[in-house]
Amino acid sequence: MAMLLRARCFHRLAIPDPRRILYKDYRTAIPQNFSNYESMKHDFKIEIPEYFNFAKDVLDQWTNTEKTGKRLSNPAFWWVDGNGKEVRWSFEELGSLSRKFANILTEACSLQRGDRVMVILPKIPEWWLANVACLRTGTVLIPGTTQLTQKDILYRLQSSKSKCIITDDTLAPAVDIVAAKCENLHSKLIVSQHSREGWGNLKEMMKYASDSHTCVDTKHNELMAIYFTSGTTGPPKMIGHTHSSFGLGLSVNGRFWLDLIASDVMWNTSDTGWAKSAWSSVFSPWTQGACVFAHYLPRFDSTSILQTLSKFPITVFCSAPTAYRMLIQNDITSYKFNSLKHCVSAGEPINPEVMEQWKKKTGLDIYEGYGQTETVLICGNFKGMKIKPGSMGKPSPAFNVEILDENGTILPPGQEGDIAVQVLPDRPFGLFTHYVDNPSKTASTLRGNFYITGDRGYMDEDGYFWFVARSDDVILSSGYRIGPFEVESALIEHPSIAESAVVSSPDPIRGEVVKAFIVLNPDYKLHDQEQLKKEIQEHVKKTTAPYKYPRKIEFIEELPKTVSGKVKRNELRRKEWTTT
Protein backbone atom coordinates (compact mmCIF):
# COMPACT_ATOMS: atom_id res chain seq x y z
CA MET A 1 0.00 0.00 0.00
CA ALA A 2 1.52 3.30 -1.11
CA MET A 3 0.74 5.16 2.09
CA LEU A 4 2.58 2.56 4.15
CA LEU A 5 5.68 2.83 2.00
CA ARG A 6 5.73 6.59 1.78
CA ALA A 7 5.21 7.42 5.43
CA ARG A 8 7.29 4.47 6.66
CA CYS A 9 5.45 4.57 9.94
CA PHE A 10 2.73 1.97 9.67
CA HIS A 11 3.23 -1.74 9.87
CA ARG A 12 1.75 -4.17 7.37
CA LEU A 13 -2.00 -3.84 6.99
CA ALA A 14 -3.68 -6.14 9.50
CA ILE A 15 -6.31 -8.45 8.02
CA PRO A 16 -9.22 -8.88 10.47
CA ASP A 17 -9.67 -12.19 12.20
CA PRO A 18 -12.80 -13.67 10.55
CA ARG A 19 -14.00 -14.86 13.95
CA ARG A 20 -14.76 -11.24 14.77
CA ILE A 21 -17.20 -11.11 11.89
CA LEU A 22 -18.81 -14.51 12.46
CA TYR A 23 -19.20 -14.20 16.21
CA LYS A 24 -20.49 -10.84 17.39
CA ASP A 25 -19.71 -11.55 21.05
CA TYR A 26 -16.04 -12.21 20.30
CA ARG A 27 -13.97 -10.46 22.98
CA THR A 28 -10.36 -10.67 23.96
CA ALA A 29 -7.74 -8.70 25.83
CA ILE A 30 -5.10 -9.96 23.40
CA PRO A 31 -3.72 -7.10 21.30
CA GLN A 32 -4.43 -7.16 17.58
CA ASN A 33 -1.51 -4.97 16.51
CA PHE A 34 1.38 -5.98 18.78
CA SER A 35 2.52 -8.91 20.88
CA ASN A 36 3.20 -7.22 24.22
CA TYR A 37 4.09 -3.81 25.64
CA GLU A 38 7.84 -4.30 25.83
CA SER A 39 8.16 -5.46 22.23
CA MET A 40 5.89 -2.64 21.07
CA LYS A 41 8.02 -0.03 22.82
CA HIS A 42 11.28 -1.57 21.64
CA ASP A 43 10.31 -2.14 18.00
CA PHE A 44 8.49 1.11 17.31
CA LYS A 45 10.35 3.36 14.89
CA ILE A 46 9.26 6.04 12.50
CA GLU A 47 10.82 8.07 9.74
CA ILE A 48 9.10 11.37 9.03
CA PRO A 49 8.87 12.08 5.29
CA GLU A 50 9.61 15.58 4.01
CA TYR A 51 6.09 15.83 2.61
CA PHE A 52 3.01 14.44 4.29
CA ASN A 53 -0.71 15.11 4.01
CA PHE A 54 -3.14 12.87 5.86
CA ALA A 55 -5.88 13.25 3.25
CA LYS A 56 -3.63 12.23 0.38
CA ASP A 57 -1.28 9.77 2.07
CA VAL A 58 -3.78 7.99 4.31
CA LEU A 59 -7.41 8.58 3.38
CA ASP A 60 -6.92 8.37 -0.37
CA GLN A 61 -4.81 5.25 0.07
CA TRP A 62 -7.64 3.60 2.00
CA THR A 63 -9.87 4.50 -0.95
CA ASN A 64 -7.49 2.60 -3.21
CA THR A 65 -7.54 -0.33 -0.79
CA GLU A 66 -11.35 -0.35 -0.96
CA LYS A 67 -11.31 -0.38 -4.74
CA THR A 68 -8.99 -3.38 -4.86
CA GLY A 69 -11.20 -5.30 -2.43
CA LYS A 70 -8.51 -5.55 0.25
CA ARG A 71 -10.66 -3.77 2.84
CA LEU A 72 -13.86 -5.39 4.07
CA SER A 73 -17.15 -3.57 3.45
CA ASN A 74 -17.03 -1.50 6.63
CA PRO A 75 -18.05 2.18 6.35
CA ALA A 76 -15.35 4.80 6.80
CA PHE A 77 -17.90 7.06 8.49
CA TRP A 78 -21.20 6.21 10.15
CA TRP A 79 -23.37 8.95 11.63
CA VAL A 80 -26.73 8.68 13.38
CA ASP A 81 -29.01 11.07 15.22
CA GLY A 82 -31.81 10.57 17.70
CA ASN A 83 -34.50 10.59 15.01
CA GLY A 84 -33.44 7.52 13.08
CA LYS A 85 -31.47 9.34 10.40
CA GLU A 86 -28.21 7.74 9.29
CA VAL A 87 -25.33 8.74 7.04
CA ARG A 88 -22.74 6.21 5.86
CA TRP A 89 -19.74 6.95 3.70
CA SER A 90 -17.08 4.73 2.25
CA PHE A 91 -13.57 6.15 2.00
CA GLU A 92 -14.30 6.83 -1.67
CA GLU A 93 -17.42 8.83 -0.79
CA LEU A 94 -15.58 10.67 1.97
CA GLY A 95 -12.92 11.58 -0.57
CA SER A 96 -15.40 12.83 -3.16
CA LEU A 97 -17.37 14.97 -0.70
CA SER A 98 -14.26 16.40 0.94
CA ARG A 99 -12.86 17.39 -2.46
CA LYS A 100 -16.09 19.28 -3.17
CA PHE A 101 -15.70 21.03 0.19
CA ALA A 102 -12.06 21.79 -0.62
CA ASN A 103 -13.08 23.47 -3.88
CA ILE A 104 -15.55 25.65 -1.99
CA LEU A 105 -12.78 26.79 0.36
CA THR A 106 -10.35 27.63 -2.43
CA GLU A 107 -12.75 28.94 -5.07
CA ALA A 108 -15.82 30.43 -3.37
CA CYS A 109 -13.92 31.55 -0.25
CA SER A 110 -10.62 32.38 -2.04
CA LEU A 111 -8.61 30.70 0.71
CA GLN A 112 -4.98 29.86 0.16
CA ARG A 113 -2.52 27.48 1.76
CA GLY A 114 -1.80 28.59 5.34
CA ASP A 115 -5.00 30.63 5.76
CA ARG A 116 -6.89 29.91 8.96
CA VAL A 117 -10.40 28.49 9.10
CA MET A 118 -12.46 28.45 12.30
CA VAL A 119 -14.95 25.59 12.47
CA ILE A 120 -17.65 25.67 15.14
CA LEU A 121 -20.06 22.85 14.42
CA PRO A 122 -21.78 20.16 16.48
CA LYS A 123 -21.39 16.46 15.70
CA ILE A 124 -22.80 16.62 12.19
CA PRO A 125 -21.22 15.10 9.06
CA GLU A 126 -20.07 18.50 7.79
CA TRP A 127 -17.66 18.78 10.72
CA TRP A 128 -15.72 15.76 9.46
CA LEU A 129 -15.80 17.07 5.89
CA ALA A 130 -14.43 20.41 7.09
CA ASN A 131 -11.52 18.61 8.75
CA VAL A 132 -10.58 16.75 5.59
CA ALA A 133 -11.19 19.75 3.31
CA CYS A 134 -8.75 21.83 5.36
CA LEU A 135 -6.18 19.06 5.04
CA ARG A 136 -6.62 18.92 1.27
CA THR A 137 -6.27 22.69 0.84
CA GLY A 138 -3.44 23.20 3.31
CA THR A 139 -5.58 25.64 5.28
CA VAL A 140 -5.26 25.64 9.06
CA LEU A 141 -8.21 24.19 10.97
CA ILE A 142 -9.25 25.92 14.21
CA PRO A 143 -12.00 23.95 15.99
CA GLY A 144 -14.29 25.54 18.56
CA THR A 145 -16.91 24.13 20.90
CA THR A 146 -20.52 25.02 20.14
CA GLN A 147 -20.86 26.37 23.67
CA LEU A 148 -18.77 29.43 22.86
CA THR A 149 -20.39 32.79 23.51
CA GLN A 150 -20.25 35.92 21.39
CA LYS A 151 -17.34 37.17 23.49
CA ASP A 152 -15.47 33.87 23.11
CA ILE A 153 -15.94 33.87 19.34
CA LEU A 154 -14.70 37.44 19.02
CA TYR A 155 -11.53 36.67 20.97
CA ARG A 156 -10.80 33.55 18.95
CA LEU A 157 -11.43 35.15 15.58
CA GLN A 158 -9.25 38.14 16.41
CA SER A 159 -6.36 36.29 18.03
CA SER A 160 -6.23 33.54 15.39
CA LYS A 161 -6.61 35.98 12.47
CA SER A 162 -9.06 33.56 10.90
CA LYS A 163 -10.11 34.39 7.35
CA CYS A 164 -13.11 32.07 7.28
CA ILE A 165 -15.62 30.73 9.77
CA ILE A 166 -17.92 27.73 9.34
CA THR A 167 -20.84 27.32 11.74
CA ASP A 168 -24.60 26.68 11.90
CA ASP A 169 -27.83 28.57 12.61
CA THR A 170 -27.22 28.60 16.35
CA LEU A 171 -24.03 30.66 16.35
CA ALA A 172 -24.35 32.59 13.09
CA PRO A 173 -26.12 35.55 14.82
CA ALA A 174 -23.25 35.87 17.31
CA VAL A 175 -20.73 35.81 14.47
CA ASP A 176 -22.61 38.54 12.61
CA ILE A 177 -22.48 40.79 15.67
CA VAL A 178 -18.69 40.52 16.05
CA ALA A 179 -17.65 40.11 12.40
CA ALA A 180 -17.08 43.84 11.84
CA LYS A 181 -14.42 43.78 14.59
CA CYS A 182 -12.51 40.95 12.90
CA GLU A 183 -10.47 42.56 10.13
CA ASN A 184 -9.12 39.27 8.75
CA LEU A 185 -12.50 37.57 8.44
CA HIS A 186 -13.82 37.70 4.88
CA SER A 187 -15.74 34.44 4.36
CA LYS A 188 -18.61 32.90 6.30
CA LEU A 189 -20.11 29.49 5.57
CA ILE A 190 -23.26 28.21 7.24
CA VAL A 191 -24.57 24.66 7.50
CA SER A 192 -28.29 25.28 7.30
CA GLN A 193 -31.49 24.48 5.45
CA HIS A 194 -32.05 28.21 5.03
CA SER A 195 -30.14 31.06 3.41
CA ARG A 196 -28.64 33.85 5.50
CA GLU A 197 -27.51 37.22 4.21
CA GLY A 198 -23.74 37.52 3.94
CA TRP A 199 -23.19 33.77 4.29
CA GLY A 200 -22.49 31.01 1.82
CA ASN A 201 -24.89 28.10 2.29
CA LEU A 202 -22.67 25.04 2.41
CA LYS A 203 -25.42 22.52 1.68
CA GLU A 204 -26.41 24.36 -1.50
CA MET A 205 -22.82 24.95 -2.58
CA MET A 206 -21.97 21.26 -2.16
CA LYS A 207 -24.65 20.37 -4.72
CA TYR A 208 -22.81 22.19 -7.50
CA ALA A 209 -19.17 21.94 -6.44
CA SER A 210 -16.78 19.81 -8.46
CA ASP A 211 -15.24 16.77 -6.81
CA SER A 212 -12.09 17.17 -8.89
CA HIS A 213 -9.40 18.63 -6.66
CA THR A 214 -5.65 18.19 -6.36
CA CYS A 215 -4.51 17.84 -2.76
CA VAL A 216 -1.87 20.33 -1.66
CA ASP A 217 1.56 18.75 -1.16
CA THR A 218 2.15 19.90 2.40
CA LYS A 219 5.47 19.57 4.19
CA HIS A 220 5.28 17.46 7.32
CA ASN A 221 6.17 20.42 9.57
CA GLU A 222 3.64 22.86 8.14
CA LEU A 223 1.01 24.16 10.54
CA MET A 224 -2.10 21.99 10.22
CA ALA A 225 -4.34 23.01 13.12
CA ILE A 226 -4.61 25.39 16.06
CA TYR A 227 -6.38 24.39 19.27
CA PHE A 228 -7.40 26.85 21.95
CA THR A 229 -6.76 25.62 25.47
CA SER A 230 -7.50 27.15 28.85
CA GLY A 231 -4.76 28.22 31.22
CA THR A 232 -4.48 29.65 34.70
CA THR A 233 -3.46 33.15 33.68
CA GLY A 234 -4.67 35.17 30.75
CA PRO A 235 -7.08 34.14 28.01
CA PRO A 236 -6.99 30.75 26.22
CA LYS A 237 -3.73 29.95 24.45
CA MET A 238 -3.30 28.72 20.89
CA ILE A 239 -1.53 25.39 20.42
CA GLY A 240 -0.04 24.68 17.01
CA HIS A 241 0.06 21.19 15.50
CA THR A 242 1.63 20.20 12.19
CA HIS A 243 0.67 17.67 9.55
CA SER A 244 3.04 15.18 11.16
CA SER A 245 2.51 15.90 14.87
CA PHE A 246 -1.14 14.82 14.67
CA GLY A 247 -1.38 13.30 11.18
CA LEU A 248 1.42 10.83 11.92
CA GLY A 249 1.70 11.16 15.69
CA LEU A 250 -1.80 9.89 16.38
CA SER A 251 -0.96 6.62 14.66
CA VAL A 252 0.40 5.72 18.12
CA ASN A 253 -3.06 6.17 19.63
CA GLY A 254 -4.87 4.30 16.90
CA ARG A 255 -2.53 1.36 16.59
CA PHE A 256 -1.52 0.76 20.19
CA TRP A 257 -3.88 2.35 22.73
CA LEU A 258 -7.11 1.94 20.74
CA ASP A 259 -5.72 -1.21 19.07
CA LEU A 260 -7.81 -0.62 15.95
CA ILE A 261 -7.90 -2.55 12.69
CA ALA A 262 -9.90 -1.91 9.52
CA SER A 263 -12.95 -3.93 10.60
CA ASP A 264 -13.42 -1.95 13.83
CA VAL A 265 -16.15 0.61 14.51
CA MET A 266 -14.86 3.37 16.81
CA TRP A 267 -17.15 5.66 18.83
CA ASN A 268 -15.68 8.62 20.68
CA THR A 269 -18.08 10.91 22.55
CA SER A 270 -15.81 13.98 22.78
CA ASP A 271 -17.06 17.43 21.81
CA THR A 272 -15.95 18.56 18.36
CA GLY A 273 -14.24 21.64 19.81
CA TRP A 274 -11.54 19.72 21.64
CA ALA A 275 -8.33 18.05 20.51
CA LYS A 276 -9.66 14.72 21.81
CA SER A 277 -11.92 14.63 18.76
CA ALA A 278 -8.83 14.83 16.55
CA TRP A 279 -7.39 11.99 18.63
CA SER A 280 -10.25 9.53 18.47
CA SER A 281 -12.77 10.81 15.92
CA VAL A 282 -10.46 11.58 13.01
CA PHE A 283 -6.78 10.60 12.84
CA SER A 284 -6.51 7.52 15.07
CA PRO A 285 -9.33 5.44 13.57
CA TRP A 286 -8.79 6.52 9.97
CA THR A 287 -5.06 5.82 10.19
CA GLN A 288 -6.04 2.22 10.86
CA GLY A 289 -8.77 2.16 8.22
CA ALA A 290 -11.44 1.77 10.92
CA CYS A 291 -14.95 3.21 10.83
CA VAL A 292 -15.59 6.48 12.69
CA PHE A 293 -18.99 6.25 14.39
CA ALA A 294 -20.76 9.41 15.55
CA HIS A 295 -24.05 9.93 17.36
CA TYR A 296 -25.48 13.43 17.36
CA LEU A 297 -26.93 13.98 20.83
CA PRO A 298 -27.94 17.54 21.83
CA ARG A 299 -26.89 16.68 25.37
CA PHE A 300 -25.29 13.75 27.16
CA ASP A 301 -27.87 11.12 27.97
CA SER A 302 -26.69 7.91 29.60
CA THR A 303 -29.68 5.88 28.44
CA SER A 304 -29.11 6.91 24.81
CA ILE A 305 -25.42 6.02 25.11
CA LEU A 306 -26.21 2.53 26.39
CA GLN A 307 -28.90 1.98 23.77
CA THR A 308 -26.48 3.01 21.03
CA LEU A 309 -23.75 0.68 22.30
CA SER A 310 -26.31 -2.12 22.29
CA LYS A 311 -27.94 -1.35 18.92
CA PHE A 312 -24.90 -0.68 16.71
CA PRO A 313 -21.82 -2.89 16.09
CA ILE A 314 -19.46 -0.58 17.98
CA THR A 315 -16.26 -2.40 18.89
CA VAL A 316 -14.22 0.37 20.53
CA PHE A 317 -15.69 3.01 22.85
CA CYS A 318 -13.95 6.12 24.18
CA SER A 319 -15.42 8.57 26.67
CA ALA A 320 -14.53 10.75 29.64
CA PRO A 321 -14.58 9.40 33.21
CA THR A 322 -17.66 11.53 33.88
CA ALA A 323 -19.56 9.55 31.26
CA TYR A 324 -18.57 6.22 32.77
CA ARG A 325 -19.59 7.49 36.23
CA MET A 326 -23.02 8.33 34.86
CA LEU A 327 -23.35 5.11 32.86
CA ILE A 328 -22.74 2.80 35.82
CA GLN A 329 -25.67 4.38 37.65
CA ASN A 330 -27.94 2.64 35.12
CA ASP A 331 -28.99 -0.99 35.02
CA ILE A 332 -26.28 -1.88 32.51
CA THR A 333 -26.94 -5.61 32.85
CA SER A 334 -30.21 -5.13 30.94
CA TYR A 335 -28.22 -4.20 27.81
CA LYS A 336 -26.22 -6.53 25.58
CA PHE A 337 -23.06 -5.16 24.01
CA ASN A 338 -22.41 -7.99 21.58
CA SER A 339 -19.74 -6.19 19.55
CA LEU A 340 -18.02 -4.04 22.18
CA LYS A 341 -14.55 -5.35 23.01
CA HIS A 342 -12.40 -2.39 24.05
CA CYS A 343 -13.17 0.63 26.27
CA VAL A 344 -10.84 3.56 26.88
CA SER A 345 -10.99 6.76 28.90
CA ALA A 346 -9.10 10.05 28.87
CA GLY A 347 -9.46 13.71 29.77
CA GLU A 348 -9.15 13.37 33.54
CA PRO A 349 -8.22 10.64 36.03
CA ILE A 350 -10.80 7.88 36.36
CA ASN A 351 -11.71 6.49 39.76
CA PRO A 352 -10.72 2.86 40.42
CA GLU A 353 -14.23 2.31 41.81
CA VAL A 354 -15.74 3.27 38.45
CA MET A 355 -13.41 0.89 36.62
CA GLU A 356 -14.38 -1.90 39.00
CA GLN A 357 -18.13 -1.30 38.58
CA TRP A 358 -17.84 -1.11 34.77
CA LYS A 359 -15.89 -4.37 34.69
CA LYS A 360 -18.40 -6.01 37.00
CA LYS A 361 -21.38 -4.96 34.88
CA THR A 362 -19.94 -5.35 31.37
CA GLY A 363 -17.03 -7.75 31.72
CA LEU A 364 -14.79 -5.15 30.07
CA ASP A 365 -11.82 -3.24 31.43
CA ILE A 366 -11.40 0.50 30.96
CA TYR A 367 -7.97 1.34 29.55
CA GLU A 368 -7.05 4.79 30.79
CA GLY A 369 -4.84 7.05 28.70
CA TYR A 370 -3.03 10.28 29.47
CA GLY A 371 -2.13 13.08 27.10
CA GLN A 372 -2.67 16.75 26.43
CA THR A 373 -3.79 19.06 23.67
CA GLU A 374 -0.07 19.62 23.17
CA THR A 375 0.68 15.93 22.64
CA VAL A 376 -0.52 12.59 21.42
CA LEU A 377 -0.82 9.77 23.98
CA ILE A 378 1.88 10.21 26.64
CA CYS A 379 1.05 7.22 28.83
CA GLY A 380 -1.55 4.53 28.53
CA ASN A 381 -2.85 1.20 29.67
CA PHE A 382 -2.49 -1.12 26.70
CA LYS A 383 -4.20 -4.42 25.90
CA GLY A 384 -2.18 -7.37 27.11
CA MET A 385 -0.81 -5.29 29.99
CA LYS A 386 -1.74 -5.69 33.63
CA ILE A 387 -4.03 -2.80 34.58
CA LYS A 388 -3.34 -1.05 37.85
CA PRO A 389 -6.58 0.83 38.61
CA GLY A 390 -5.86 4.52 39.08
CA SER A 391 -2.61 4.42 37.11
CA MET A 392 -2.07 6.20 33.79
CA GLY A 393 -0.16 3.15 32.63
CA LYS A 394 3.23 3.17 30.92
CA PRO A 395 4.78 5.55 28.35
CA SER A 396 3.48 5.29 24.79
CA PRO A 397 5.95 4.34 22.04
CA ALA A 398 6.05 8.00 20.96
CA PHE A 399 7.75 9.35 24.08
CA ASN A 400 10.43 8.92 26.69
CA VAL A 401 8.65 10.00 29.89
CA GLU A 402 10.35 10.84 33.18
CA ILE A 403 9.60 12.45 36.54
CA LEU A 404 11.75 15.54 37.19
CA ASP A 405 12.47 17.77 40.14
CA GLU A 406 12.57 21.57 39.87
CA ASN A 407 16.20 21.44 38.72
CA GLY A 408 15.54 19.00 35.88
CA THR A 409 16.99 15.97 37.68
CA ILE A 410 15.31 12.65 36.91
CA LEU A 411 13.72 11.30 40.08
CA PRO A 412 13.73 7.63 41.13
CA PRO A 413 10.56 5.53 41.44
CA GLY A 414 8.21 6.58 44.21
CA GLN A 415 9.19 10.25 44.29
CA GLU A 416 6.68 12.87 43.17
CA GLY A 417 7.71 15.47 40.63
CA ASP A 418 6.85 17.02 37.29
CA ILE A 419 5.74 14.69 34.49
CA ALA A 420 8.07 15.43 31.58
CA VAL A 421 8.70 14.31 27.99
CA GLN A 422 12.22 14.21 26.56
CA VAL A 423 12.61 16.57 23.57
CA LEU A 424 16.40 16.63 23.11
CA PRO A 425 18.50 15.62 21.31
CA ASP A 426 15.63 14.41 19.09
CA ARG A 427 12.25 16.10 19.36
CA PRO A 428 9.38 13.57 19.34
CA PHE A 429 7.09 13.74 16.32
CA GLY A 430 3.85 13.67 18.36
CA LEU A 431 4.45 16.97 20.15
CA PHE A 432 3.05 20.41 19.37
CA THR A 433 5.38 22.95 17.78
CA HIS A 434 4.66 26.05 19.84
CA TYR A 435 2.08 28.25 21.50
CA VAL A 436 1.11 30.47 18.57
CA ASP A 437 2.21 34.11 19.01
CA ASN A 438 3.42 33.32 22.54
CA PRO A 439 7.16 32.54 22.53
CA SER A 440 7.56 33.17 26.27
CA LYS A 441 4.93 30.55 27.10
CA THR A 442 6.58 28.11 24.70
CA ALA A 443 9.98 28.67 26.33
CA SER A 444 8.51 28.25 29.82
CA THR A 445 7.58 24.63 29.11
CA LEU A 446 11.21 23.57 28.64
CA ARG A 447 13.51 22.40 31.42
CA GLY A 448 16.83 21.14 30.15
CA ASN A 449 16.15 18.37 27.65
CA PHE A 450 12.50 18.01 28.63
CA TYR A 451 9.06 19.39 27.92
CA ILE A 452 7.22 19.94 31.21
CA THR A 453 3.59 18.88 30.98
CA GLY A 454 2.43 20.99 33.91
CA ASP A 455 1.19 17.90 35.74
CA ARG A 456 2.59 16.26 38.85
CA GLY A 457 3.00 12.54 39.30
CA TYR A 458 5.33 9.68 40.14
CA MET A 459 6.48 6.39 38.64
CA ASP A 460 6.28 3.17 40.63
CA GLU A 461 8.82 0.33 40.70
CA ASP A 462 7.06 -1.43 37.81
CA GLY A 463 7.30 1.58 35.50
CA TYR A 464 3.66 2.63 35.83
CA PHE A 465 2.94 6.36 36.06
CA TRP A 466 0.50 7.83 38.57
CA PHE A 467 -1.17 11.22 38.32
CA VAL A 468 -1.07 13.34 41.49
CA ALA A 469 -2.28 16.82 40.57
CA ARG A 470 -2.02 19.60 38.05
CA SER A 471 0.83 21.98 38.59
CA ASP A 472 -1.40 24.77 37.40
CA ASP A 473 -4.96 25.47 38.45
CA VAL A 474 -6.85 24.33 35.39
CA ILE A 475 -10.09 22.59 36.33
CA LEU A 476 -11.11 19.36 34.59
CA SER A 477 -14.86 18.97 34.85
CA SER A 478 -16.79 16.42 32.80
CA GLY A 479 -13.91 16.31 30.34
CA TYR A 480 -13.78 20.10 29.87
CA ARG A 481 -10.67 22.13 30.66
CA ILE A 482 -11.73 25.30 32.45
CA GLY A 483 -9.28 28.08 33.23
CA PRO A 484 -9.96 30.03 36.44
CA PHE A 485 -9.02 33.28 34.71
CA GLU A 486 -11.92 32.96 32.27
CA VAL A 487 -14.44 32.36 35.05
CA GLU A 488 -13.00 35.08 37.28
CA SER A 489 -13.13 37.52 34.37
CA ALA A 490 -16.83 36.78 33.97
CA LEU A 491 -17.47 37.02 37.71
CA ILE A 492 -15.84 40.41 38.11
CA GLU A 493 -18.31 41.90 35.62
CA HIS A 494 -21.15 41.32 38.10
CA PRO A 495 -21.75 44.45 40.22
CA SER A 496 -21.91 42.51 43.49
CA ILE A 497 -18.38 41.12 43.23
CA ALA A 498 -15.29 42.88 44.51
CA GLU A 499 -12.91 40.02 43.77
CA SER A 500 -12.97 36.26 43.38
CA ALA A 501 -10.86 33.14 43.11
CA VAL A 502 -11.89 30.01 41.27
CA VAL A 503 -10.68 26.49 42.11
CA SER A 504 -11.75 22.91 41.60
CA SER A 505 -14.05 21.17 44.05
CA PRO A 506 -14.69 17.41 44.27
CA ASP A 507 -17.90 16.08 42.76
CA PRO A 508 -19.05 12.44 42.74
CA ILE A 509 -20.36 12.59 39.16
CA ARG A 510 -18.21 15.15 37.33
CA GLY A 511 -14.99 14.37 39.16
CA GLU A 512 -14.57 18.02 39.95
CA VAL A 513 -16.55 21.20 39.42
CA VAL A 514 -15.90 24.92 39.43
CA LYS A 515 -16.11 26.60 42.82
CA ALA A 516 -15.89 30.36 43.25
CA PHE A 517 -14.75 32.05 46.45
CA ILE A 518 -16.24 35.53 46.28
CA VAL A 519 -15.66 38.75 48.20
CA LEU A 520 -18.78 40.89 47.91
CA ASN A 521 -18.95 44.63 47.52
CA PRO A 522 -20.26 46.24 50.74
CA ASP A 523 -23.63 47.17 49.20
CA TYR A 524 -24.46 43.51 48.58
CA LYS A 525 -23.49 41.92 51.88
CA LEU A 526 -27.04 42.13 53.24
CA HIS A 527 -28.70 40.67 50.15
CA ASP A 528 -30.33 37.24 50.18
CA GLN A 529 -27.21 35.14 49.62
CA GLU A 530 -28.91 32.12 48.05
CA GLN A 531 -30.70 34.33 45.56
CA LEU A 532 -27.48 36.21 44.84
CA LYS A 533 -25.66 32.94 44.13
CA LYS A 534 -28.27 32.05 41.52
CA GLU A 535 -27.99 35.50 39.92
CA ILE A 536 -24.20 35.19 39.73
CA GLN A 537 -24.41 31.71 38.21
CA GLU A 538 -26.83 32.91 35.54
CA HIS A 539 -24.57 35.89 34.84
CA VAL A 540 -21.57 33.63 34.20
CA LYS A 541 -23.60 31.34 31.94
CA LYS A 542 -24.48 34.33 29.76
CA THR A 543 -21.01 35.88 29.84
CA THR A 544 -18.93 32.85 28.91
CA ALA A 545 -19.49 29.25 27.80
CA PRO A 546 -22.20 27.77 30.08
CA TYR A 547 -20.13 24.75 31.17
CA LYS A 548 -17.72 27.12 32.94
CA TYR A 549 -20.19 28.52 35.47
CA PRO A 550 -19.41 27.93 39.19
CA ARG A 551 -21.66 25.17 40.45
CA LYS A 552 -20.49 26.03 43.96
CA ILE A 553 -20.13 29.51 45.47
CA GLU A 554 -18.84 30.54 48.86
CA PHE A 555 -18.84 34.14 50.09
CA ILE A 556 -15.80 35.06 52.18
CA GLU A 557 -14.46 38.26 53.74
CA GLU A 558 -11.09 38.20 52.00
CA LEU A 559 -8.99 36.01 49.74
CA PRO A 560 -5.72 34.49 50.97
CA LYS A 561 -2.82 36.20 49.21
CA THR A 562 0.96 36.15 49.04
CA VAL A 563 3.04 39.14 50.11
CA SER A 564 3.15 40.20 46.47
CA GLY A 565 -0.64 40.21 46.27
CA LYS A 566 -1.15 36.99 44.31
CA VAL A 567 -4.17 34.91 45.27
CA LYS A 568 -3.14 31.66 46.96
CA ARG A 569 -5.37 29.32 44.97
CA ASN A 570 -3.43 26.31 46.22
CA GLU A 571 -4.52 27.10 49.77
CA LEU A 572 -8.17 27.42 48.74
CA ARG A 573 -8.04 24.24 46.70
CA ARG A 574 -6.30 22.29 49.46
CA LYS A 575 -8.94 23.40 51.94
CA GLU A 576 -11.70 22.49 49.51
CA TRP A 577 -10.41 18.99 48.80
CA THR A 578 -9.54 18.32 52.45
CA THR A 579 -12.82 19.41 54.01
CA THR A 580 -15.31 18.41 51.29
Swiss-Prot record:
Pfam families given in the database record: AMP-binding, AMP-binding_C
Class of the enzyme per the UniProt entry, highest EC level: ligase
Chief location: mitochondrion
EC identifiers of the protein: 6.2.1.2, 6.2.1.17
Residues reported to bind ATP: 229-237, 368-373, 455, 470, 566
GO terms under biological process: acyl-CoA metabolic process; fatty acid biosynthetic process
Family matches, as InterPro entries: AMP-bd_C (IPR025110), AMP-bd_C_sf (IPR045851), AMP-binding_CS (IPR020845), AMP-dep_synth/lig_dom (IPR000873), ANL_N_sf (IPR042099), Mitochondrial_ACSM (IPR051087)
PTM-bearing positions, type N6-acetyllysine: 151
A GO term, aspect molecular function: fatty acid ligase activity
Localization annotation: Mitochondrion; Mitochondrion matrix
GO CC field: mitochondrial matrix; mitochondrion
Keywords: Acetylation, ATP-binding, Fatty acid metabolism, Ligase, Lipid metabolism, Magnesium, Metal-binding, Mitochondrion, Nucleotide-binding, Transit peptide
UniProt KW Calcium keyword: no
Superkingdom to which the source organism belongs: Eukaryota
Cofactor(s) of this protein: Mg(2+); Mn(2+)
Biological role stated in the UniProt entry: Catalyzes the activation of fatty acids by CoA to produce an acyl-CoA, the first step in fatty acid metabolism. Capable of activating medium-chain fatty acids with a preference for isobutyrate among fatty acids with 2-6 carbon atoms.
Similarity field: Belongs to the ATP-dependent AMP-binding enzyme family.
UniProt name for this protein: Acyl-coenzyme A synthetase ACSM3, mitochondrial
